[in-house]
């Protein structure tokens, strides 16, 4: 069973040469989950040879730019690469509006469907499959902010 985390970026809001805004990639049995999507996330994905098509779930912790401003670029890259599978985006109130408004104003129609999942509470179960469960943990920040707990399920022998 594979379960690991790759740090694509961990820099603060200010840009620094050689450091990138927040993004982490969780690999669970070759299923990739992206946590946050700061600017340059796609560059880091290319550097680490991460195929975009393997990401079906994106979790955004909060709406400070260093955690989500790379998301629209990634959404459009998925489209340009011919993605047809649904994409699930989990985030706080307002994220759906941000993405929807950008799609409307650019008169863009995606090849795939985005499903928005609103994070509303602490200890909320966001995702579950046969291997893992993903829960929220409320963080102490100036605006609503959530951490994500990826918990492996017990294997039956």
Residues of each region from the PLM?
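Binuclear metal-dependent hydrolase catalytic cores
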Residues: 1-157
């Amino acid at each position: 069973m594979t379960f690991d985390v790759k740090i694509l970026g961990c820099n603060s809001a200010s840009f620094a040469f050689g450091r990138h805004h927040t993004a982490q990639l969780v690999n669970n049995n070759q299923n990739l989950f992206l946590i946050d999507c700061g600017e340059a996330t796609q560059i880091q994905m290319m550097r680490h040879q991460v195929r975009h098509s393997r990401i079906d779930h994106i979790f955004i912790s909060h709406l400070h730019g260093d955690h989500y401003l790379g998301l629209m670029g990634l959404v459009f890259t998925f489209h340009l690469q011919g993605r047809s599978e649904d994409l699930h985006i989990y985030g706080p109130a307002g994220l759906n509006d941000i993405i929807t408004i950008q799609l409307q104003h650019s008169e863009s129609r995606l090849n795939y469907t985005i499903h928005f999942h609103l994070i509303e509470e602490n200890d909320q179960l966001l995702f579950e499959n046969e291997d893992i469960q993903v829960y929220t943990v409320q963080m102490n920040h100036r605006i609503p902010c959530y951490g994500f707990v990826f918990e492996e399920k017990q294997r039956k022998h």
